[in-house]
Amino acid sequence: MPLADNTIVLKSKDEIEKLRRANIVVAEILARLTDVIEPGVTGLELERICEGEIKKRKVEAAFKGYRGYPYCLCVSVNEMVVHGFPSKRTFREGDLVSIDFGVLLDGFYGDSAVTVPVGKISSDAARLVDTTRASLDRGIDAMRVGNRVQDISSAVQSEVEGAGFSVVRAFVGHGIGRNLHESPQVPNFGKPGKGMRLKEGMVLAIEPMVNAGGCDVKILDDGWTAVTTDGTLSAHFEHSVAVTRDGPYVLSRI
C-alpha cells in the first residue's frame, strides 16, 4: 500500500502513548481471534467477531474502506502472503492463518499481524513460523537511535535467509501515526549502515513476510490477495514500534 507522503513525522511522548493505546486494542483483538482459530472455523467468522469487538471498543477499523479494501481483517491462509479476504473457506488441521489488523483510535493508528497454526502443523511449517517471528524480534532489536533503516532490514533478512527461507520484497514495513502508512518504507532486505538514520520519536511498523520457497509473489484476480508464485507456505508477523532513547518500545505487544 502506498505511503501518505515522504515526510518523516517524529512523535512526542504523548503521541506515542496514544499510539500505544490504539495498538493495545489491536493486540487484544488479535489475541481474541487467535483463541478461536481451529479446524472448521472460517475467515468470515473471524471478521464477524472482529466487527463485534470494534463496536464494543468504540474504535474504527483501519483497513475497511482504505483504498477500497472491503474488510476489517486481512486473513491470509497458507500460500497467501498478505491482504487475503476473509472467506467461507474452513480452516483445516495443518493450515497457517495470518491475520493482519489495524484500528484508528483518537486520531492514531494501530497495526499488527500474527500467523497462527491451525491444530498440529508440520515441522517445516513450524520452523517457518518460528523463523518469521524471530526475524521480527531481530529487526525490532535494531531499532535504536543512530542506527539506520536498513540495519532493521538486514537483521530481518539475515535471520530469514540463514534458515533457508526467503523474504518477500514486494511489500515492506512503514511508518505509522496519524496515517496508517507513513514514511519511511522499511524493507525486509538491505545492507547494514544504509538508509535513513533512526531518530527518537520515529514509529515504524516492522512486518517480515517470509516464504518457505522463493520470494516472488503474484496478485489474484480480486486485486488484493498476494500469494507465493511457487505455491509454498508464507508467514507474516508485525509490530508497531517506537524508537526511544532507551531502545525500541513495542507498542502492539501485551
Located regions from the model:
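Active-site neighborhoods and metal-handling regions in enzymes and metal-associated proteins
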Residues: M1-I254
